[in-house]
Amino acid sequence: MASSEEDGTNGGASEAGEEKEAPGRRRRLGLLATVWLTFYNIAMTAGWLVLAIAMVRFYMEKGTHKGLYKSIQKTLKFFQTFALLEIVHCLIGIVPTSVIVAGVQVSSRIFMVWLITHSIKPIQNEESVVLFLVAWTVTEITRYSFYTFSLLDHLPYFIKWARYNFFIILYPVGVVGELLTIYAALPYVKKTGMFSIRLPNKYNVSFDYYYFLLITMASYIPLFPQLYFHMLRQRRKVLHGEVIVEKDD
């Protein structure tokens, strides 16, 4: 499930286990991390802007969404796969976001791009694909712009406002688009048995991709409200200065 809840891309290097390291080296590591993260976020902002322009240009020229995915798929695949670096950033400690949170966010996008839309060509012209592509594109332009300006210590209020308001509409739209796309893929997956492992085989294991997709769709039911309301709490905290008290489970 696409989510933009993490707010940790601040360029701060982790100092866990580095208590005896010279302060000068820690500062250099922090500077290097900040430079790299600034470059990364500028590149990702530019990439999603290119994607947005390509989508608008295609629709203006063709007047239809059919063929849109095919026309932008290389750019989409490159920049979405490039986002795997965000997991690496967490692993090496240059951002304070949880590895699990980053992993879920990035892997859900990779799953939709490579294992659904890329692999099941008959669904590429579905309107639901355009739905999540538009939601992702606006979300990512806003998110990476927010990170870039934050790293540069010059965050325009509009970018901050957009970061914590656009998701109110875009997040549900993206989720609906993803769910409808997976649903559209089900008949093809069931008919072809793609990615499924049948018994008997020498490993004595089985896997049914069709039922895996059903379980994936069902997982949105508990996850979406949890993530959405977390983001709403973050919005109140950042934009309105409310103190949010998290209840212990």
From Swiss-Prot:
EC number annotated for this UniProt entry: 4.2.1.134
Region annotation Disordered: where it falls in the sequence: 1-22
Membrane-traversing stretches: 37-56, 76-92, 103-120, 127-141, 165-182, 213-230
Listed GO CC annotations: endoplasmic reticulum; endoplasmic reticulum membrane
Pathway entry: Lipid metabolism; fatty acid biosynthesis
Annotated catalytic residues: Y171, E178
Reactions this protein catalyses: a very-long-chain (3R)-3-hydroxyacyl-CoA = a very-long-chain (2E)-enoyl-CoA + H2O; (3R)-hydroxyhexadecanoyl-CoA = (2E)-hexadecenoyl-CoA + H2O; (3R)-hydroxyoctadecanoyl-CoA = (2E)-octadecenoyl-CoA + H2O; (3R)-hydroxyeicosanoyl-CoA = (2E)-eicosenoyl-CoA + H2O
Keywords (A to Z) from UniProt: Endoplasmic reticulum, Fatty acid biosynthesis, Fatty acid metabolism, Glycoprotein, Lipid biosynthesis, Lipid metabolism, Lyase, Membrane, Protein phosphatase inhibitor, Transmembrane, Transmembrane helix
Function: Catalyzes the third of the four reactions of the long-chain fatty acids elongation cycle. This endoplasmic reticulum-bound enzymatic process, allows the addition of two carbons to the chain of long- and very long-chain fatty acids/VLCFAs per cycle. This enzyme catalyzes the dehydration of the 3-hydroxyacyl-CoA intermediate into trans-2,3-enoyl-CoA, within each cycle of fatty acid elongation. Thereby, it participates in the production of VLCFAs of different chain lengths that are involved in multiple biological processes as precursors of membrane lipids and lipid mediators.
Name of the protein described by the UniProt record: Very-long-chain (3R)-3-hydroxyacyl-CoA dehydratase 1
Organism: Canis lupus familiaris (Dog)
Lineage: Eukaryota, Metazoa, Chordata, Craniata, Vertebrata
